[in-house]
Amino acid sequence: MPPMTIKDGEYTATVYKMIKEGRYGDAIHILSKEHQKHTKSRAALSLLGYCYYHMQDFTNAAECYEQLTQLHPEVEDYKLYYAQSLYGACAFPEAMKSTFLLDNTTSHTKMIKLQAAIKYGEEDYSGAKTLVEQLPQEDPDYDVDLGCLLYKEGEFEEACKKFMSSMNVLGYQPDLAYNIALCYYSLKQYASALKYIAEIIERGIREHPELSIGMTTEGIDVRSVGNTLILHETALIEAFNLKAAIEYQLKNYAAAQEALTDMPPRSEEELDPVTLHNQALMNMDTKPTEGFEKLAFLLQQNPFPPVTFGNLLLLYCKYEYFDLAADVLAENAHLTYKFLTPYLYEFLDAMITCQTAPEEAFRKFDENAGKLTEQLRKVTKQVQEARHNRDDESLKKYVQDYDEVLEKYIPVLMAQAKIYWNRENYSMVEKIFHKSLEFCNEHDTWKLNVAHVLFMQDNKYKEAIGFYEPIVKKHYENILNVSAIVLANLCVSYIMTSQNEEAEELMRKIEKEEEQISYDDPDKKIFHLCIVNLVIGTLYCAKGNYDFGISRVIKSLEPYNKKLGTDTWFYAKRCFLSLLENMAKHMIMLRDSVVQECIQFLEHCELYGKDVLAIIEQPLEEDRMHIGKNTVTYESRLIKALFYEVTGWNE
């Protein structure tokens, strides 16, 4: 931006015009130069402090007001603004100390409110409550403050009533609407929460078109709106983050990501900790390296979202970075007791132990599972009693309690089973699942994993169908919402139990849905039917029928521009490498026409695979593959060279 030239005598008018238009950054640019010339200028410092405060830059605002309190100790307002700026900058001890300088009776109520807010920020809720109770009950903030304290005590319904009561008195306020939505979210009443969120967003769009809501999602390139006081007062950032959290909980992952891109645009360095955390979490599948960097960065900030610590550790375990998880736990022992529940700590401890002492880990998981089983039995009894007494309110609460305990039990059970799964001891995995039958038989994750373990045992395809079928039928009208590997395993199970018609019908259904999507979006790659055919081809190759199996694999990747991807190449190359191994051992002979077909296939992969990654590298991998080697083109050339060598065609 070129330097602005302002005529003498127009400085004040220009600066005030900028402030009126909300151009605080431009005003700061001019005022900073003025302050450098006149370091004790009351006007420059006062306006700078005001602009910094409105841009939510509380640290710089506090510096301005600190100087003003020293230059003009008689002005009570500067002392108040200094304390408020320190509070905004999360410098709670300094903010509390500065409130004691407020000695004017007119600012006494403001001082009490600020001290209560500081105690609340320090998580001293009893101290905050003592101060709030000193406020007159007719004060509009009294119920709001009590609502916040009730929320922290887990009294979500009572907190909600306080916020609603305040809204009736004060009229509509976005921050109160957000507080009500947050209470409903905590009560798992997502529809009610979304209703209040929708109103915040609709009002934001209507009243503040300059905030560019939804523009980023639509692909429009817009400049950052910055962290202004206006943005803060709209509660839009909080509302979009809460909407993203709800959609994420409901497993509507695309909608969750859209909620984050719909919020008013800001540059990455302007993002608040909650948005940064949610971006990391919700883009983890596509940008895991960035996700880990953001979460690790947040741990160094003060404050950071309380769930950051646990989420970073869980994600390290998910991506099998157990050493990193152990290091983070060891280096942040002070955070362990504050941010991890006993359940989560024990779960993470067992996960990390798995790598060095699987038997010890199994024992830890078993102990944890035992505690949760006891809780499930206790809550089951409470559910039965509530049903018997026709106590609908208690029944609703106990069913919710049961679901919460079950959601803790399932990961423990799966982690326990994975120890034996990794050893390919599938019968033991089946026994572990059988033990949990009474609690988990209606849970989709449990049913899916039971299906997988039955499928892996070769002689239990019929039983596997019994678990796969309900999952597929549940989503039959939107069959592409089902994982491709589930559809593939069900088709294989049908084939292995001579139910070829059912397999063909399922494949026709998948093909029909894929054709519809291709019609609506011709450039979109869809791999479901391709993976089903690849798995069937792999099955025939595993049974030694390479002629048919390889032919099926080749046909499944046509057309290559739509079907060749990292996952599909993974399945295809396994079949070709298995074929080459058996040919090299002289265990099978291939007809020349089939060899020719294989060479042509690899040449097509070479042609279309230039921009397709051969493997997805681990996000925190230090020794990265050469970019030219991690392509389908490179690997298909290698396999083609092996074909020439094994068949002698290059001689």
From Swiss-Prot:
Pfam families cross-referenced by the UniProt entry: TPR_2, TPR_6
Entry's Gene Ontology BP terms: cilium assembly; determination of left/right symmetry; establishment of planar polarity; intraciliary transport; opsin transport; protein polyglutamylation
GO cellular component, one term: axonemal microtubule
Coiled coil residues, start to end: 494-521
Compartment annotation: Cell projection, Cilium
Tissue spec. comment: Localizes to the cilia of many ciliated epithelial cell types including pronephric cells, olfactory placode, the brain ventricle and lateral line organs.
PROSITE patterns found in the cross-reference section: TPR (PS50005), TPR_REGION (PS50293)
A single MF term (Gene Ontology): intraciliary transport particle B binding
Primary residence: other
Keywords, ordered alphabetically: Cell projection, Cilium, Cilium biogenesis/degradation, Coiled coil, Repeat, TPR repeat
TPR repeats: 8-41, 42-75, 140-173, 175-207, 379-410, 411-443, 445-478, 530-563
Similarity annotation: Belongs to the TTC30/dfy-1/fleer family.
Reported function: Plays a role in anterograde intraflagellar transport (IFT), the process by which cilia precursors are transported from the base of the cilium to the site of their incorporation at the tip. Required for polyglutamylation of axonemal tubulin, which is a prerequisite for correct assembly of cilia and for normal cilia beat amplitude. Does not seem to be required for neuronal microtubule polyglutamylation.
PANTHER family: TETRATRICOPEPTIDE REPEAT PROTEIN 30
Protein name listed in UniProt: Intraflagellar transport protein 70A
Organism: Danio rerio (Zebrafish)
Gene name as annotated: ift70a
